[in-house]
């Protein structure tokens, strides 16, 4: 949806922009298009003809981090801010901050709910995790009330994707 014409990209519709740079609510019409992407989108890397020459970087900073090696959405959703900071230390992911991280996860969880059978164990676990977050209320530090409201709005949207 970000490619709007020949050699034209609308960055406001780009998944990388929405998940990394954009600090407000993600537009409703773009949320389903994000799928399970919570930090950027490297689809352009797959399409780039020059990448057929790419080689694996031999720099430790580019190695897979254990906490980010194939985690589930539920694993990532269970992190508190301290865990987020610990697991993203030295990673570019850290710069989005914990609030955008949770916002992006809520969208991905909503999309997972829309794509899974409502009778499945995974569907139930996603619902339970989102409802648990909602039940805690907006416990945010003074001056950070807007952060809680941003995540709450995306959690409510995600819950709405569960179907009947």
Description of each model-found segment:
Residues 1-16, 37-39, 43-61, 129-130:
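Iron-sulfur cluster-binding cysteine motifs and their immediate structural context
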Residues 66-99:
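Alpha-helical adaptor scaffolds
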Residues 85-87, 117-135, 142-143, 164:
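Amphipathic alpha-helical scaffolding segments comprising HEAT/armadillo-like alpha-solenoid repeats
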Residues 101, 139-152:
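Positions within the helices of HEAT/ARM-like alpha-solenoid repeats
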Residues 102-108:
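HEAT-repeat alpha-solenoid elements in large eukaryotic scaffold proteins
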